[in-house]
Design a protein with these regions (language model features):
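Extracytoplasmic/lumenal domain signature
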Residues: 1-31, 36-46, 58-105, 136-194, ...
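Long, low-complexity segments enriched in small/aliphatic residues
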Residues: 92, 102-105, 111-135
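Extended hydrophobic secondary-structure segments that form protein cores and membrane-embedded regions
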Residues: 50-53
Length: 257
């Protein structure tokens, strides 16, 4: 069940179905990113679906009752696989991406095209708002005995961003149409590792950024409406609450892991 989505009965833990997003995972691509439930109109019929945009760069839509893979498309720059075969449900991998004989540069890196930072779905616009990041990685086989004294030891031998040119690294607020499986709009950011998103019924979407800004956008078109300087980076997702009839937005600031 490595890098898998599992459906379990809550009363007894019985496994109902599972879907593996990255079989034989060897790049630190996980399937622990947020899962969103919604009802989408697919082929003229309402379907109760499960949606996920994991680190591997593919946006998955599954029937949440049966685990049937309905669609899967790249939501950003992905070079480790050509596509997801909808018949087998498995990725069609690019040659050499398992770095068995020589190192490989590929997208995304272990930072992921989308990491733990929350995405949000707006039923009114029908869009998913993803904290997208574009960070390539250098993967190499350094052997089982290799250990980094001052770094992460994941067994992948993946690089950190010091090996990557600064101009190759970026982030964005990405509005994704899960029905058509395509980008609706995006707002580029100068850096990656930006905050999670919040979408509201008032046609608003909020996101904090690594450079310390909290932005409000129109949810349908991505027009920036206002910004607030938090004076420190933001990685958390904002929340909204009502007090004495007024709606407020709050976010925890402080840039980190």
């Amino acid at each position: 069940y490595l890098s898998s989505i599992l459906a379990l009965r809550p009363d007894n833990g019985k496994l109902l179905w599972h879907y593996q997003t990255t079989p034989g995972e060897t790049w630190d691509f996980t399937a622990t990113q947020q899962i969103t439930l919604a009802t989408l109109e697919l082929d003229g019929k309402p379907r109760k679906v499960l949606m996920q945009a994991p680190k591997n760069g593919f946006f998955y839509v599954l029937d949440r009752a049966t685990g049937e893979l309905l669609s899967a498309e790249k939501f950003g720059k992905v070079t480790w696989a050509e596509k997801i075969d909808l018949t087998t449900g498995r990725p069609v991998e690019a040659p050499g991406v398992r770095y068995e004989k020589e190192q490989v540069v590929m997208w995304p890196s272990s930072f992921g095209a989308h990491n733990w930072h929350s995405m949000s779905f707006n039923p009114q616009t029908g869009l998913m708002y993803i904290p997208y990041q574009e960070v390539p990685g250098v993967y190499r086989n350094e052997g089982a005995a290799f250990k980094k004294i001052d770094g992460l030891n994941t067994g992948t031998g993946f690089s950190d961003t010091h090996e990557i040119p600064r101009e190759a690294v970026s982030g964005a607020l990405l509005a994704w149409d899960p029905v058509c499986q395509r980008e609706a709009w995006r707002v580029p950011h100068s850096f990656y590792w930006n905050g999670g998103t919040l979408s509201t019924a008032g046609n608003l979407v909020f996101q904090g950024t690594a450079d310390g800004q909290l932005h409000a956008y129109s949810a349908d078109k991505g027009q920036r409406l206002w910004s607030f300087a938090a004076q420190t980076g933001i990685v958390a997702a904002p929340i909204s609450f009502s007090l004495d009839g007024e709606q407020y937005v709050a976010v925890m600031a402080g840039w980190g892991g």
